[in-house]
Every structure is written in structure tokens, then in C-alpha cells.
Amino acid sequence: MNITKNLKETKAVGKYIRLSPHKVRRVLDQIRGRKYQEALIILEFMPYRACYHIKQILESAGANAEHNNGLNKNQLFITKAFADKGPTLKRFQPRAQGRAFPIHKPTCHITLGVSE
């Protein structure tokens, strides 16, 4: 007998964030599956630059869940957390003797899903 619980999932997406998706995934792996309040505390004290952006998106997902779906923030947990690669900004660094070296500035799209 297969019983599936009807989960009302709410999500928030941050797009074109100027961080490498590889470095963002390092933080997302730490909070995936955790409770909403616990994840906020973890993000507050982790030393990575990505934490600031992920925390903002997580707070937005919590507000969306509370306002749009009437869910309680204290009972939320993170069901989805992933970072996709965005477009790469291409710049040039001037070098000696008229040369130019390419610089690639990666961007990413962060998606967080929460439910009760």
C-alpha cells in the first residue's frame, strides 16, 4: 500500500546571482532537508559568501509559504535546494605587450522549496 502525503510546497528563486554554482552547492548541501529555523541559524554563522544570498532566498520562501499558502514558519522544512548554472559574464584583463586574458565571471540561479 503506497501512501503519499499531500505536501503544499512553496518555492523562491534567486536568479543571476554573481556566485559560482559550485560554491553555492557547498552551502545548499548543508541545509537541504533541515527545518526552516535551523537552516537560518546555520546560514547566519557559516563563513561563506553564498550564505547571505541563500538566507535571503530562504526568508523569501518562508514569507511566500506564510502569505500565499497559510503555512506556519515554525513547522516548515526545506524540501528542495539546488543551484543551476546561469550565464557567464565574459571580461578581459589587459596583460603585457598588448595581450588580453579572458576572465569568466559565473552566475547561478538558486531555487529553494519549503513545505510542512
From Swiss-Prot:
Pfam families: Ribosomal_L22 (PF00237). Keywords: Chloroplast, Plastid, Ribonucleoprotein, Ribosomal protein, RNA-binding, rRNA-binding. It comes from the Eukaryota. Gene3D superfamilies: Ribosomal protein L22/L17 (3.90.470.10). CDD domains: Ribosomal_L22. InterPro entries: Ribosomal_uL22 (IPR001063), Ribosomal_uL22_bac/chlpt-type (IPR005727), Ribosomal_uL22_bac/org-type (IPR047867), Ribosomal_uL22_CS (IPR018260), Ribosomal_uL22_sf (IPR036394). GO terms for biological process: translation. GO terms for cellular component: chloroplast; large ribosomal subunit. The keyword RNA-binding applies. It is found in: Plastid, Chloroplast. GO terms for molecular function: rRNA binding; structural constituent of ribosome. Disulfide bonds: none annotated. The keyword Transmembrane does not apply. PANTHER family: CHLOROPLAST 50S RIBOSOMAL PROTEIN L22-RELATED, LARGE RIBOSOMAL SUBUNIT PROTEIN UL22M. This protein binds specifically to 23S rRNA. The globular domain of the protein is located near the polypeptide exit tunnel on the outside of the subunit, while an extended beta-hairpin is found that lines the wall of the exit tunnel in the center of the 70S ribosome. Belongs to the universal ribosomal protein uL22 family. HAMAP family: Ribosomal_uL22_B (MF_01331_B). Part of the 50S ribosomal subunit. This is Large ribosomal subunit protein uL22c. It comes from Porphyra purpurea. The lineage of its organism: Eukaryota, Rhodophyta, Bangiophyceae, Bangiales, Bangiaceae.
